[in-house]
């Protein structure tokens, strides 16, 4: 499952271990019990979420492949209970792939420059920076040094492996109007995948544990 985001980004589900019933089994092992009927299993998930018993959800694990601007990735990496591997600008020549916000992104802001001109200025700086990057590489400067001229809207790619408990924490903080708009779009994509793979857990999360706002305002 792959969801395109922004102008060139995406979130792709690479792997998932477990589902709603994984949390049920993990919770019931405390009492040496297994699965019951669907109604009672679903009720248990709601009970766990409502009362803050979150460790059973750590037994559901997702791996995502993410392509995002560097400034989004740096916010993402603040979520530390997870595993990350990122594209290396030291070992790889970086492609000309930059996030250019549309003029509509600036609607509602009192800028002294027209939004269309802001987009143009960002594109001009990006072009100049990337040309400089290529010139440095062609002149023998190592990639690890040449890359420092590139701006934060350069796209990077990384793998993110995270359990459902930490994923829900990510959604609490990033699927929220206080987060930057760009990372909100990625959080919505993560929520959509989470809902598809763990519908009972997602529903209970929204009902009892979600602290943000935008997931309740949009259809994921």
Curated annotation (Swiss-Prot):
This is Flavin-dependent thymidylate synthase. It comes from Thermotoga maritima (strain ATCC 43589 / DSM 3109 / JCM 10099 / NBRC 100826 / MSB8). Its EC number is 2.1.1.148. DUMP binds at residues 75-78, 86-90, 147, 174. Residues 1-208 form the ThyX domain. SUPFAM superfamilies: Thymidylate synthase-complementing protein Thy1 (SSF69796). The gene is thyX. FAD binds at residues 55, 78-81, 86, 163-165, 169. InterPro entries: Thymidylate_synthase_ThyX (IPR003669), Thymidylate_synthase_ThyX_sf (IPR036098). Homotetramer. Pathway: Pyrimidine metabolism; dTTP biosynthesis.
């Amino acid at each position: 499952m792959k969801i395109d985001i922004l102008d060139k980004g995406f979130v792709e589900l690479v792997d998932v271990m477990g589902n709603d019933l994984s949390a049920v089994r993990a919770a019931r092992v405390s009492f040496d019990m297994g699965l019951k009927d669907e109604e009672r299993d679903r009720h248990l998930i709601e009970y766990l979420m409502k009362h803050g018993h979150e460790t059973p959800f750590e037994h559901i694990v997702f791996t995502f492949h993410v392509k995002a601007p560097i400034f989004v990735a740096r916010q993402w990496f603040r979520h530390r209970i997870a595993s990350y591997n990122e594209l290396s600008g030291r070992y790889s020549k970086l492609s000309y792939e930059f996030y250019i916000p549309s003029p509509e992104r600036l609607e509602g802001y009192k800028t002294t420059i027209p939004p269309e001109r802001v987009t143009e200025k960002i594109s001009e700086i990006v072009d100049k920076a990337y040309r400089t990057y290529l010139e440095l590489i062609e002149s023998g400067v190592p990639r690890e040094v040449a890359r420092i001229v590139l701006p934060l809207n350069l796209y990077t790619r990384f793998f993110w492996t995270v359990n459902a408990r930490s994923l829900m924490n990510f959604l609490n903080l990033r699927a929220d109007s206080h987060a930057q708009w760009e990372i909100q779009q990625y959080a919505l994509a993560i929520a959509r995948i989470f809902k598809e793979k763990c519908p009972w857990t997602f529903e209970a999360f929204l009902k009892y544990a979600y602290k943000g706002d935008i997931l309740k305002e949009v259809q994921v």
